Amino acid sequence: MHKKLPFLKVDGTRIVNEAGRPVRLKGVNLGGWLMMEGYMLFGRNIPEKAFKEQFEKALGREALEDFTRSFRDTFIREEDIRTIKSWGANCIRIPFNYRLIEFEDQPFSLNEEGLRYLNRAVDWCEKYGIYCILDMHAAPGAQNPGWHSDCYGHQELFSNEFNKDRYLRLWRFLAEQYKDSSAVAGYDVLNEPVLPFTNEAALKDLYVKATKEIRDADTKHIIFLEGNFWAQRLASLGRPEDPNTAYSIHTYAPYDFTHNFKIGLYYPGRAYSIIWNKKRFEMLAKPYRMFMEHNDVPLYMGEFGVNARDGHFGEVKWVEDMLSVFKDNGISWTYWTYKTVANYAFPDGVYRYLDNPPWVNRQGPIYGWETYASLWPREKGRMIFSWRTENFTLNKKLYAVLEKGFAEKK
């Protein structure tokens, strides 16, 4: 058991501990665990709820509950938190689906079985002396049209008062739940919101209300607010009304390179008729640095990541340059993501599953998690075992760069 972590707070453009010492958060995301995503299991990017509806239709409610419990118990375990701590990281971002803690068909209910996993993760972080950030990755009604907000392309959080009430009530509950846990660095209250630029005031209004709900229960933890348009536009947020607030941004630029959507792109190199290199990222960081200083607020890069191609296309150099820019600008960061089934596209994990059993089935035509329902009755044991990190392979080149970043004192 590690010594109890001190609470963190915001001090101008820095995050500091209770003694006033600066703490730059550096770590990884636990993507795909409490908010499942298709590509991370070598599947199509359909909403998690669509996958589960198909699974239940094929095998029934009891089998779905058995699958869900088995996956959550296995994909991330205590050993994983210990491993991340051993790397030298000091923070883990934990994305979760609101459906983890509220039954969709029972608004304002509490799913105690789901909450147990968040509690367990926080307890592990306390045990090993590493901070965590709780990230609501999918909110009631959905905050963006992406599969990763668990919707079918239509977000209905901002336009629906009932969904907003559910969202606010959930954050009030979570703040009550974790107000005394110093291992929680803070609350990332809404992942990658998307609103028309003409309606960005609606995002700030929701953030003001969420902050009030949290502060009525918890005055200690940092509140992380993400900008509009996939956590990129901060201007409309202005200076935070609550002094213990940090702003969060995400980047996967250039998108076709980091996601391997266009064959033959290199880093440094040209994409969209622009040369992408460290100098360009330094230039792109300047407005964010000015925003930090003008509004006296810290910045946190909650997500950045790249599809691994064994380093042959400059992807490791991309990560290296990103970390250098973050360091020079005092930006905290968490890499996306800790582990995935190796895929041809989308950002990979530091750990990758390289095998090709029937439930991966890279050759298709049905592959990844859409094979699960047909295989679960006879392959359950092997599938569960395959999800353990010991069966994944460490991307040593990527890990070496991240480890160096974790070790930096600044």
Predicted stretch roles:
Residues 37-48, 108-113, 140-161, 240-246, ...:
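Aromatic- and acidic-residue-enriched segments that line the glycan-binding/catalytic groove
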Residues 30-73, 248, 253-285, 291-292, ...:
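Glycan-binding loop/region signatures in secreted carbohydrate-active enzymes
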Residues 32-34, 98-102, 140-142, 193, ...:
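Feature marks short, surface-exposed loop/turn motifs that line or immediately flank catalytic pockets
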